[in-house]
Amino acid sequence: MTELKETLKQLISLPGLSGYETPAREVIRAAWEPLVDEISVSPIGSLHAFRRGTGPDPRPSILLAAHMDAIGLMVTGIQEGLLRFTEVGGVDPRILPGLRVTVHGRRDLPGLVVQPPDYLLEPAQRGKSVGMDHLFIDTGLEGDEVNELVRIGDLASF
């Protein structure tokens, strides 16, 4: 049971955003390889594992199906060292302010999702939940360093 718990912990901490599931797939593959007869990756990145049953025909079959991707964020712009972003998957923007993220740039960078203070928002927006168009990721780095380490299209996981 401890081994299962550790494997699950490892899986949920991996950056396996939709379309970029390779890290998660490799961990799952390593865990399943000793348990199955065949394992392969489809052209679209799905992992297929097969184990032959024992006993007389007809043998029962079991299908275990699960997704291995996770929701996350993608950098869409860089403004004075702050990162603009959009969602990858179904991210509810209400959960984002104050969320710690990892930006997967030229190296992994810790970041925090921040929003402007109320006095910088339009009066109608003050005191309310803001949309993603008002949120940024702040890595705490100077603008030049962010420009060197992060590119538009880089991902951020949480």
Predicted regions and their residues:
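N-terminal hydrophobic/helix-forming segments and targeting peptides
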Residues: 1-158
